């Protein structure tokens, strides 16, 4: 599974290159729709319905033999800086919950973006620690997280502004071919 939360230009270029691959299934999380849910009455009920929609779509990707690529829409919110920071944290926490619910199903995770990756590890997986395995590409680390079933979940921590236009595609190819683990 691949998650792209970063909004920097390089991340968008890398995402677009990845989405050109037919074995990758785009799963777009619309930031405006998420904002409406977090600003409405019945937040928890609507949020759970929204979450279940994404879990179903991601699982359907797996059933089709495709890699789900969960990404936030490339739209900008017109909020003041503190509101924007709080909103993006809520959004990243939501993504972290999705990953947590799928951790035994995904096989590996490529997480693009620092805030997103941090919240997936700390809040979603509640990881007290991970094992650094090394770098998959320059500046891009691979860690493993021990699941309760004694399996290791490889996680690529891919900062938003690091890599080339093809690094996300190249990492995906390496993990799909299982040439590393």
Predicted regions: what they are:
Residues 1-181:
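Active-site catalytic microenvironments in core metabolic enzymes, especially phosphate/sugar-handling
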């Amino acid at each position: 599974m691949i998650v792209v939360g970063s909004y920097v230009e390089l991340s968008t270029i890398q995402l677009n290159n990845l989405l050109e691959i037919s074995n990758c299934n785009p799963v777009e999380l619309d930031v405006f729709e998420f904002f409406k849910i977090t600003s409405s009455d019945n937040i928890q009920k609507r949020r759970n319905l929204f979450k279940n929609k994404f879990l179903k779509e991601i699982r359907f990707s797996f059933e089709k033999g495709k890699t789900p690529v969960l990404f936030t829409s490339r739209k900008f919110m017109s909020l003041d800086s503190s509101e924007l920071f709080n909103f993006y944290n809520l959004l990243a926490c939501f993504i972290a919950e999705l990953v947590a619910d799928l951790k035994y199903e995904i096989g590996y995770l490529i997480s693009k973006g620092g805030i997103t990756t941090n919240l997936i590890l700390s809040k979603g997986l509640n990881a007290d620690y991970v094992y650094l395995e090394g770098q998959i590409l320059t500046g891009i680390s691979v860690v493993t997280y021990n699941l309760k079933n004694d399996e290791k979940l490889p996680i690529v921590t891919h900062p938003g502004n690091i890599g080339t236009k093809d690094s996300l595609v190249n990492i995906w190819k390496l993990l799909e071919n299982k040439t590393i683990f």
